[in-house]
Structures are given as structure tokens and as C-alpha cells.
Amino acid sequence: MAVAKKVERDHNNFARGRSIPRFQRFFGFLRNSSSPPPSKPGQATIPLGQTGTMTSTLVLLRHGQSTWNLENLFTGWYDADLTDQGRAEASAAGPAMAAADVAPTVLHTSMQTRAIRTANLALDAMDRLWVPVRRSWRLNERHYGALQGMDKKETTEKYGKDQVFEWRRSYDIPPPKLELDDPRHPRFDERYASLPADVLPASECLADVVERMLPYWYDDIVPDLDAGHTVLVVAHGNSLRALIKHLDAISDADIADVNLPTGVPIRFELDDAMVPTKRLALTARYLGDAEAAKAAAEAVARQAG
């Protein structure tokens, strides 16, 4: 019963989060049609007499290189920390944002150490450790099920390139599940103790990540953007790919070709409907050294498995 209520609540929140901001904006316009809307910190304003929309800034940042990234292991929900290179990438993300005149006023992260540490290092480099922080398991990396902890190259040799590519990059085919009593199952991690075991994933495809991420987007991140915040989301390759798929309306097939470099901020300017104001290639949204970021993304694509 608890699980059923949890799922029902999430679906209700999803629908409510999708409709309320537009509802409020519409009736807010009717109430204040004789005067321009109040300006919001961090948002561009439209001078009186001109038409247009206010924009919100969203920055997505994949965590810096982790120890299991370096070892080419399927990481998933394992709580790998950053390597020295990963710490350097995270620290460099702060100046990259500052150079682009991006100053986050609220932070959202997953519950995993590599994302949390990346966020702290990036904000510390900007002298902005004070910004409010919200964390959610819904921003966690995709759970790789029974593949978690396995070497990607060895997994390819064992199961074949096509099978591993299907597990890794297909939109709706998850890897084999973990058994409930497997010590790798997230129910044994105290940070998820308040969640029912049946809600916690034992394996996920990207479609599953989209489904569990979107309620958090609508109910927690969108309200911060609506309030005028410059929002920084520090998460993982697949949870951020899920969000980018939603923002850029990428097809189920084409999302397989999207690869995110570690430690590179990606900026989106969104209109009041939370749609990107410009259709840009992802590489055009990178902050910092765009060529280095592109090379890093290509390296991700070449990983075995």
C-alpha cells in the first residue's frame, strides 16, 4: 500500500508540476495586464513597450572523473569518489561559469558523493558555497543492475559488443536486475533508508531514469527557475542525458548518440514555458574550452561497453 501511494503521489506531482507554472503565469498576466511583470533576480527583463519573454538560466554539470570512471567500470549507484583529475575538473568548472557571467543562486545534486563533491569544488572556486542546496535520489546515476562494478571491456568480451551496447545505450532495455538480497542493492545504503525497497531501482534503462527524474524537474527545479534563480544541477551522465532529452525533445533513438564530458558546465537559456530559447548543438552550450569538452565527450563515446 505504501508503495502504491508513493507511485500515485509521484504521478500526481508530475502532472501538477507540469501544469501549475503555466496556470499561474496565465492568470498572473490577467491580473497584471496593465503593468509589466516584476523583474526577477537572474532573469533578463523586457523593457516596457517591447515584446518578448523572460529567460531563466539552467546549468547542468556532470561530476568530475570518478575512480570507477578511471577504471572503466560500470558505476551506477556505487558511491565512487573523484580522482585527482576529477577534482581538478570540478574546480575548473567554477571559473568556466564565472567567465560566462553565470552565478548560480541555488544548487540541486544527487545523493552521490562524486556529484556532491563536484558541486562543492565548483562553487568554492566561485566563492559561492553559501547557495542553498537541494539533493534528491531522483538525480542519481542510472542503476546498472548486475553490471554494476563490472569492467566495461571485459563485459563486452563476455556478452558481445551488440548485447552490451543494447544494455548501455538502448532507451528501454535495462541490464539484468540485482537480486533483492544482493549487497549492491541500494536498500542496504542508509541514505535511502526512508524509501520503500520496491521504489529503489535494481536495474534501469534510460526510460526509467527519465520517469523518475521528471517529477523532480517539475516539482523542484522548475519552481526555482520560475522564482528567478540561476539553477545549477550537478548530477551524472545518464540523469543529465535524461533531462537534456526532455529539454531538447530528443528522440528515443537519437539520445543514444548524446555523450556528456565530465566536469564541463552546459548552459541552457529557457523561456517562461521552460523551453530552450535557441535550438543549439550541445557543444555550443559548453562553458569553458569547447574543443577540450568535445574531445572528452568523444572519449566517453569510445569507451568499451
What are these regions (language model features)?
Residues 2-22:
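Cationic, amphipathic, low-complexity segments that mediate targeting or membrane/lipid association
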Residues 9, 25, 41:
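Cationic, low-complexity basic patches in intrinsically disordered or flexible, solvent-exposed regions
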Residues 19, 44-45, 254:
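Generic short N-terminal amphipathic or hydrophobic helices
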Residues 36-53:
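Short, Lys/Arg-enriched N-terminal segments with co-localized hydrophobic residues
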Residues 49, 53, 92-183, 194, ...:
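Phosphate-coordination/substrate-recognition cap region in phosphate-metabolizing enzymes
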Residues 57-61, 108, 134, 229-243:
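Beta-strand elements within well-structured catalytic alpha/beta cores of enzymes
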Residues 65-125, 199-215, 257:
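Loop-to-helix element that buttresses phosphate recognition and phosphoryl-transfer chemistry
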Residues 212-227:
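Phosphate/ATP-binding catalytic cores across multiple sugar-kinase/actin-like superfamilies
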